[in-house]
Every structure is written in structure tokens, then in C-alpha cells.
Amino acid sequence: LVIGADGVNSWVRNQAKIKVSQHSYQQNGIVANFSTELSHQNIARQWFHRDGILALLPLSGKLVSMVWSADEEQSTRLNSLSEAEVCQQVEEASNHALGKLQLMTKPVSFPLNSVHVKNLIGPRLALIGDAAHGIHPLAGQGVNLGLRDARKLVSTIIERGARSDCGDYMLLRQYERARKENILAMEFTTDSLQKLFSNKNPTLTRLRNLGLILTNEFPLLKRRLIQHSLN
């Protein structure tokens, strides 16, 4: 059994001639790691701006990983900044929530695309992670989706027993059927959210912001959204 887990531009998938459909979000993702003055308290934070979405994701200690989904004009500007200017921009865009920031890794940018993979399997082949799907990072679900792929593939193989053929077509079809619905739902959700948050219609923007404020004010609703994301 060959497992393709080699990213959104998967060489394994291409060699297997598995069809892919994709479209560009006309945005770039800019990633970097920072050390923070204040504790992140293991909370992932996002800020929605007219020209992009900034996310700071907690790492160990006082480290965070930044993902800034920016339109092409904004990403070009950010890529031209010095290290000190990048820190200042992120501090301002995050409302100084984590205090002073220090850049730990050089910012890297990449184009953001929606990638739909027609089949998750081939002859003695299974795709997992970004090789099996490519979604917008705004919901922070790409890693979770890939981990669920891996968990389902492993559990499907284990359930068949030690003496079974792990590359058996029917076994791989069982894995594919089990994962398709969740992947399609996440692709639809992230695509819809991206369209919602990139829309600059004033009325829609006000309604969207009101929805975020109300969600933040109701802990039970937030917990349910978190649980849904984890499951």
C-alpha cells in the first residue's frame, strides 16, 4: 500500500493520474512564527479585516504561528516589509492582543486555492491530508481534516485484521466512503466562509460582524462550535 501524504501539489497523486479540480481565491497565505510578550493561553485567535484575515495559532511556550490570508495587493505590501515592520503590522492587526511580537521565522507566502480531489484512492494507493483536499485556512481545519484521514485509514486497516491485505481495493473503498462526506462538507463550509468574509457589501458586513459578536458573547454556542470542529 502506498499512502500519498505529500501535500497539496502531491507527486504521488499526479503519478496516479487522479483528477483534481481547483480554483484560486485570489489571495495569498503568509505564514511565520513569532514569540509573544503575553501568554496566548492556548487560544487560537482571528481578526477579520477588509483586505484579509489574520490568524495567530498557539504553539508551545510563548510561540504562535501566523497565517495571514491577504488579497494580492496586501500580500505584496507585507512581503516588502522589514522584520520590524512585519512585527508592527501584525501587532496592530491583532489589536496588540499578545503584546510585543518578535519574528522567529522568515515570512513565506503561497497562493491560496480550493483543491477538490475526485478520488481518494487508486490501485494500492490511498491519499490523506493535503494530498486529498485543499481548503481555505480561515477556519483552521486543514490539519484536523488530515488527521481524521489518517485515523480513519489506520482504523479501517486494523479492523480488517493483521492477516488482511492492506492494499485491498474494497478496504480502500471503505476508507474513501467514510471520508468523502466530511471532506465535502468542510470544502463547502470553508468556501462559503471565504466568500462571506471577502464580500465588501456594507449590509452583509454589518450582519456578519453582528453574528461574530453574538457568537463571542455566548459560551455555550462557542463550545458547540469548538466541539464540532474537533469532531
Residue ranges and their predicted role:
Residues 22, 58, 145, 181-185:
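A generic short alpha-helical patch detector that favors 3-5-residue windows
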Residues 1-107:
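Conserved FAD-binding catalytic core of PHBH/FMO-like flavoproteins
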Residues 74-169:
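FAD/FMN-dependent oxidoreductases across multiple families
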Residues 9, 27, 147-150, 179, ...:
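Short amphipathic alpha-helical/adjacent loop interface patches that line ligand
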Residues 14-15, 138, 157, 203:
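Short, function-defining helix-loop hinge/capping sites that tune catalysis or transport
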Residues 155-231:
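C-terminal helical "tail/cap" subdomain of flavin- and related membrane-associated enzymes
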